[in-house]
């Protein structure tokens, strides 16, 4: 008799994806609950660690967002998106499993802070632009 165990990356990947897939409800831009698909991958396993969005494509927000994107890109696989409403951009990243979305808005231009949104809790916190890389690093690679 021959025992031939099989344990490949395919099965582990499928197990992670099946465990992470979730459908829940979250408020849209108008405060109405909408169904959303979320890939709740552990931040260490998520292929894209963060996404950077300017709230609108004017008033200097894209330039600030692109600078932040370039700074994050040095340490992490990050995504930049400026197409469509910010709520839709959040939903696209939720589906892709991106744990954190960073939004540059009007307040960012005044006080040099951005909003970091957590995919799982939907919590949003303001963080100084200069601290974003270390903040994402602490969240993605906790000690």
Regions found by a protein language model. Give the residues of each.
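NTP/phosphate- and nucleic-acid-binding module
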Residues: 1-143
